[in-house]
């Protein structure tokens, strides 16, 4: 039951006020300036703080985790900056284990406490298993939604007709969120190991072969989607695979979908005339299986903070 805030749509909705509060808080910090970076100033901190809340980690540490994962995705793997970012990981991992030890002594209703009490086949998780799961949850929480939101805001910022369509038709936010999930497929590929000899569409695959699944290709399959290279905000049906499939489907899909929707809606509601500084947009360079933005600078008409 304690995993419900991640897994169950109804429970995820209870987190919506917190998401909205954080979205507007970070917009308020820059809204009077008339310019901001929608990645560094907005799309990175908001999901990171929500992730801290779910895991039970201190809110004030959001930037430590967000900066690490953002740097690992954004920087070339052969750069000294990438090496420096990776070098921060062991201390953060130890911090996660120390935090878990404190939760073991005093459990609460967060996901870390749930994992500490979780049993599989009568056994609790080892420290290594616990660290691996928490690390993956934090990584997914602080980066993938950031990437999806940033790419969405870039696309809407450079396609004013779509942006205006969404502003004029707020009932489209849910379908638009799914359509842009399909279109970008932030987690573009996943590798798997073949468990038995099989032939698929005439191609033999042998046991223990490694294969790459392309979610991006599946989400742009002309046999499944009409005009797949076009963003259609009210596309229906939309059986995209942006969150994967089967037992490995993203556990936080409902959370990520709502968070992306809330953050995009807040931007279009508060700074609807934002203009993208396209010459200074920076793509991810660190991981070929992921897509996202390192920087998304924009300008807009300065506005007042929310009262």
Residue positions per predicted region:
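Cytochrome P450
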Residues: 1-307
């Amino acid at each position: 039951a304690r995993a419900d805030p991640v897994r169950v749509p109804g429970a995820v909705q209870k987190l919506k006020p917190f998401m909205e509060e954080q979205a507007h808080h970070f917009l308020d910090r820059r809204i009077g300036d008339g310019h901001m970076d929608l990645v560094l100033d907005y799309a990175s901190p908001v999901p990171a703080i929500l992730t801290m809340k779910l895991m039970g980690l201190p809110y004030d540490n959001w930037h430590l985790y967000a900066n690490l994962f953002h740097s690992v995705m954004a920087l070339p793997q052969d750069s000294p900056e990438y090496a420096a970012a990776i070098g921060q990981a062991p201390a953060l991992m130890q911090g996660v284990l120390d935090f878990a030890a404190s939760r073991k002594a005093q459990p609460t209703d967060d996901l870390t406490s749930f994992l500490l009490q979780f049993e599989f086949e009568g056994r609790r998780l080892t420290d290594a298993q616990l660290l691996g799961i928490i690390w993956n949850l934090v990584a997914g929480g602080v980066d993938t939604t950031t990437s999806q939101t940033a790419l969405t805001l870039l696309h809407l910022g450079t396609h004013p007709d779509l942006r205006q369509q969404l502003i004029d038709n707020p009932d489209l936010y849910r379908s638009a969120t799914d359509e842009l999930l399909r279109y970008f497929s932030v987690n573009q590929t996943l590798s798997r190991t073949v468990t038995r000899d099989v032939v698929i569409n005439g191609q033999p695959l042998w046991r223990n072969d490694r294969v790459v699944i392309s979610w991006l290709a599946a989400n742009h399959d002309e046999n499944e989607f009409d005009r797949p290279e076009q963003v259609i905000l009210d596309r229906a049906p939309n059986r995209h695979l942006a969150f994967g499939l089967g037992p490995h489907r993203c556990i936080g899909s409902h959370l990520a979908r709502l968070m992306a929707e809330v953050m995009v809606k807040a931007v279009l509601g508060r700074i609807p005339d934002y203009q993208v500084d396209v010459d200074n947009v920076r793509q991810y360079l660190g991981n070929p299986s992921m897509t996202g933005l390192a920087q998304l600078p924009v300008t807009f008409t300065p506005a007042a903070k929310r009262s």
